[in-house]
């Protein structure tokens, strides 16, 4: 059996640019791409925390160290500057890979979209 699993996530990153007339895509700071194991032209899902929009596009490289998250083309209509988004990518994983310990790459950022931490799992949600 094969499963479609979360592969990569950049959590609560702020939109820094919206370029309506740029060729469609999402430019992401190269440091963030590498940390999250997302490659250029890979399909990504973007979930806007501020307005609930959910959409797909593809990743392109943004200037390394800049904190850039640029929504381009029609994606620019889905967010405003400063909106917090989650960027995710998925992979098809077989049972053997899962049993061998396959884990996702989760990246967390500060208020300037700089990496503040990473981990390989989402913690169990508990009632408080």
UniProtKB/Swiss-Prot annotation:
Pathway participation: Cofactor biosynthesis; (R)-pantothenate biosynthesis; beta-alanine from L-aspartate: step 1/1
Q: Which UniProt keywords apply?
A: Autocatalytic cleavage, Cytoplasm, Decarboxylase, Lyase, Pantothenate biosynthesis, Pyruvate, Schiff base, Zymogen
Q: Tell me which Gene Ontology terms the entry assigns under biological process.
A: alanine biosynthetic process; pantothenate biosynthetic process
Q: Does the keyword Disulfide bond apply?
A: no
Q: Which residues carry this modification: Pyruvic acid (Ser)?
A: 25
Query: SUPFAM superfamilies, from UniProt?
Result: ADC-like (SSF50692)
GO MF annotations in UniProt: aspartate 1-decarboxylase activity
Superkingdom field: Bacteria
Major localization class: cytoplasm
Question: What is the annotated localization of this protein?
Answer: Cytoplasm
Q: How does it assemble?
A: Heterooctamer of four alpha and four beta subunits.
UniProt record similarity statement: Belongs to the PanD family.
This chain's protein is named Aspartate 1-decarboxylase
Gene behind this chain?
panD
